[in-house]
Amino acid sequence: MPLPPPSPFHQHIALPERTALLLSMLAPWPRRGRELLVIGCGAGHVLPPLWQSGFDLSACETSPALREQARRRAPQGVEIEAASPDWLPFADNSFDWVLLRADELPPAALPAALSEACRVAACGLALTFWNSASLPWLTWRLHGRRHAWPGHCLPFWTAWRLLAARPGRLHAASCLWRPACRWHHGTHVHAAALSRLPFGAWCVLRLDMSPRRTGTPLPLRLRPRLDTARPVMEYDSLRTTGQPPAQKQHP
């Protein structure tokens, strides 16, 4: 029997855990002067945390009702476009980073959506989805709770194979290891919950298409240290001779 489509009511389920995992996975991406496109932003719950973490944001959503909710939640200046994940009205390499939220996307539509996301992404792509190869999913199926699962889902290895065919380095992480009936009990977010094993109910895959660049450089440490402030030109003689330069005698 086919599963019912996900309800927008379930988009906030386990939101702190999922947001913490997403921000942890996107942490290596540089922010300064870079733009992130969120495909399928839904009701916009994810937009404020991404904006607060330093990304310049753009977003798109198919549903008019969800677009209106996203506009109310989005930070000032964030554009919410009307676009389908499998056809984006953007030129190639229009955005540095792309986040494709496949939480409410039917599995059959994922290959076309990934193709479009990779087309408009210049440096990296992240994919979020509900994982059917997880203990919570199996528990939910055994108890027959077909009406309670928060979104469309697919096995982890299916999403991995689709992204592994693209050039770049692939990373994975997941959260929500407990049965779905325990997600409503508001747990504290710990680092242990952000597992790099892809067997939780909600997964994030990150594809880095370009080599990672360094961020703000650390201060250089000069050895031996100067005991007093001196002009930079004089330090070269100290480094080569090991002795401080002779002081000039003024008449």
Where are these regions (language model features)?
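Class I SAM-dependent methyltransferase SAM/SAH-binding core
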Residues: 37, 42-87
